[in-house]
Amino acid sequence: MEAAAPLVIEARAIAKRFGHVTALRGVDLTLEPGEVLGVVGDNGAGKSTLMKVLSGLHQPSSGELLINGEAVRFGSPRDARQRGIEMVYQDLALAGNLRIDENILLGRERTRAIGPLRLVDHAANVALAKQHLDKLRIHVKSVSQRVEDLSGGQRQAVAIARATAFDAKVVIMDEPTAALAVREVRRVLDLIKDLKTHGIGVILISHRLDDIFYVCDRVMALFRGANFAEAPLGEVERDEVIGWIMGNKRQEDAPVGAGAN
Amino acid sequence: MTEAASPELAGELVDADQQSRRSIRLMAFFDRFGVLLLVLVMGALSYAAQPEVFLSSNNIANIFRQTAFLALLALGQFLVIVTAGIDLSVGSTLALAMMSAAVLSVAGVPWPILILTPFAVGTAVGLVNGLGLTKLHMPHPFIMTLGMLNIARGLTNLISGGVPISGLPAEVRWLGAGNLVLGGIEIPVSVIAVIVSFALAWLFLEHTRTGRHIYAIGGNPQAARVSGINVDRTLVIVYALCGLLAGFSGLLLAGRTGSGFPNAGIGAELDAISAVIIGGASFFGGRGTVLGVFAGVLVIGMMRNLLNLSNVQVFWQQVLIGVVIIAIVAFDVLRRRAAASS
Ligand SMILES: Nc1ncnc2c1ncn2[C@@H]1O[C@H](COP(=O)(O)OP(=O)(O)OP(=O)(O)O)[C@@H](O)[C@H]1O
Ligand SMILES: [Mg+2]
């Protein structure tokens, strides 16, 4: 393990309890730089909870989190963001009443001093947002459209642009295609491939195996809050992954050093 | 940068639906200027009904002077409503701020301190509202501020023995009832105070990070939180500002009447909410403009004025204001539906 390329994320034995509910019972997860990892599992398997731990929204009940080999403790999403870990939430974390550029820069707006005042530099923010959308080749009629006037896929693109606007090393996406029309799904998946070419690691949660097989390098399955199986995409069949989701597997798919009992 | 993998991605990922763009533009126009049209309509109606009185500079100045205290209450209420909150305590806060100044005046406290007192009292009440809401994890600001409505009114009566106090110093009265001569025109001081407050609020909401975060919180508090915005701190600032403006409002009212009276501002929170809603702000947060609130206040002020001039009974005025609130919001809903389905 130690000899390999440095892992951007290494989560060890993460557990998370909500009162009497145990959502995660000792989950391991690794991510290499620029890798696209698919995470699958049945409803309630703990996928979203795990991602919220990685992105600082939840604090783990126990377990260790290492970013680039360094142990970290995230108190809030802001801490995770400072380490380059961004999340696109399942329930899109956009403010529909604000413009596209305002959403992309929310919480990180550029300001300029005017006398004793610090005012938002709207022009600079618009330019930054446009530049970033161009980089991702997301084309907008106008960044001053309100996000609520956009379609689902368009919003998803804004959410992804938001997540990658500031030196993201890892973008975590929780079912980014769940609410999208077929054409839009394809565009979002291509956007994920784009991120990979920019050296950004992606963790993708999806119930759609088509998505997983289209963009991922590796897939891991959670089952009832624990690691169940994982494999590089080239070494696994769709039917096996479907089996994992339902809790069936062949012995040799067991992840190294975990859950072999 | 590395070349991207998929050129066809360049497609219309974020692409406004062509035909809906015109209606969006029309809606944006209505969003911005709809209430101003309403002000014009009210003006035309008033003029038609009372041609010789309505446009007299005396009457206009009166409308402004009478609505100045409501304007400040509504402005504070607006900040709160943008966050999808509500502050039911502003009427009581106004009274507490006003009576605090009056009581101190009787005790012989010099006027500069009297003038600062309502601001301090209002801000303190607002801070308690904000801290109570966030630190005690109140399920809704309705509850915290409903409690405060009673607390502040009770305190108002306690410090004053429940009786009015008159004889406020001339400096205080000047703020509420005095005029400044600017370019040969007499402008009520209270009107200038209102305009400056609205201009500052506009600058704050549109051009500071905290101001933009207030809108973001109203639009989607979860989004604000995960963006690293300190939602609780922002809410405390908003309720404190609302209290500050209620205190200022109390000062103006004290100045206009030259006294403090413990029943001041009873029900004023509802007028303030009405003005904000008539002004086009959404009760669900994230929507509305300072200019709209100003127009909403004017509509209420002009309507009262028109009904007074026409000798319509006060009770009918209440009925009519109720009808106008419902009609305006219903029209707004229809307009949005039409825009959404086109
Ligand atoms: N905030 C919370 N409080 C209490 N229980 C929670 C909370 N969040 C998640 N859980 C519970 O933890 C378990 C895992 O939920 P999670 O949302 O992580 O599943 P998931 O794999 O993302 O499912 P889905 O595919 O339906 O999105 C579930 O039993 C859920 O009810
Ligand atoms: Mg989930």
Predicted regions and their residues:
Chain A
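Glycine-rich phosphate-binding loops of nucleotide-dependent enzymes
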Residues: 2-261
